[in-house]
């Protein structure tokens, strides 16, 4: 999915958010955001920690979890719960998209479908509601898992 913001712009917003919350600036927070931005995919806390440890051996998994909680609360990242691979994170500054999640291997596929978006808006209109947000996840067995199960 196309990015809606540059990494530098996100980091600048992060610095303002840290200041607004009365926290000290932390290179680790910026590094977590950078790892997620550059990955372009959904990462687990362990994968994020491993990536950061390539530069900073002192990074702990507990610090990464605390940072992820803060980033989620401040809407810098989105969390995706999968039964197979646990919580996975992605940068929030992307075009709207939905997810297909394989229940067998945990693979995550991002997609955008204008017809589905249109239909969701029609449903909202039918009930005279105001759509604030939505998050669609379809749980499947991916092609590879279907083939390996045969």
UniProtKB/Swiss-Prot annotation:
A GO MF label: DNA-binding transcription factor activity
GO biological process, one term: regulation of DNA-templated transcription
Name by which UniProt lists this protein: Ferric uptake regulation protein
Residues that, per the record, bind Zn(2+): 42, 90, 99, 102, 105, 110
Family per similarity comment: Belongs to the Fur family.
Keywords assigned: Cytoplasm, DNA-binding, Iron, Metal-binding, Repressor, Transcription, Transcription regulation, Zinc
Residues annotated for Fe cation binding in this entry: 96, 98, 117, 134
PANTHER family (UniProt xref): FERRIC UPTAKE REGULATION PROTEIN (PTHR33202:SF2), ZINC UPTAKE REGULATION PROTEIN (PTHR33202)
Region (Dimerization): 94-150
Assembly information from the UniProt record: Homodimer.
Physiological role: Acts as a global negative controlling element, employing Fe(2+) as a cofactor to bind the operator of the repressed genes.
SUPFAM superfamilies: Winged helix' DNA-binding domain (SSF46785)
Renumbered residue ranges of the record's region DNA-binding: 1-93
Compartments, as annotated in UniProt: Cytoplasm
Cellular component terms (Gene Ontology): cytosol
CDD domains in UniProt: Fur_like
């Amino acid at each position: 999915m196309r990015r809606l913001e540059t990494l530098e712009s996100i980091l600048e917003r992060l610095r303002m958010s840290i200041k607004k919350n009365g926290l000290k600036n932390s290179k680790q927070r910026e590094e977590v955001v950078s790892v997620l931005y550059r990955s372009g995919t959904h990462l687990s806390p362990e994968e994020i920690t491993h990536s950061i440890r390539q530069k900073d051996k002192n990074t702990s998994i507990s610090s990464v979890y605390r940072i992820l909680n803060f980033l989620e609360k401040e809407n810098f990242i989105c969390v995706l719960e999968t039964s197979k691979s646990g919580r996975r994170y992605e940068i929030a500054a992307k075009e709207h998209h939905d997810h297909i999640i394989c229940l067998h291997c945990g693979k995550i596929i991002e997609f955008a479908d204008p017809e589905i978006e249109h239909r969701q808006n029609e449903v909202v209109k039918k009930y005279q509601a105001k759509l604030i947000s939505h998050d669609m996840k379809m749980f499947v067995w991916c092609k590879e898992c279907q083939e390996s199960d045969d």
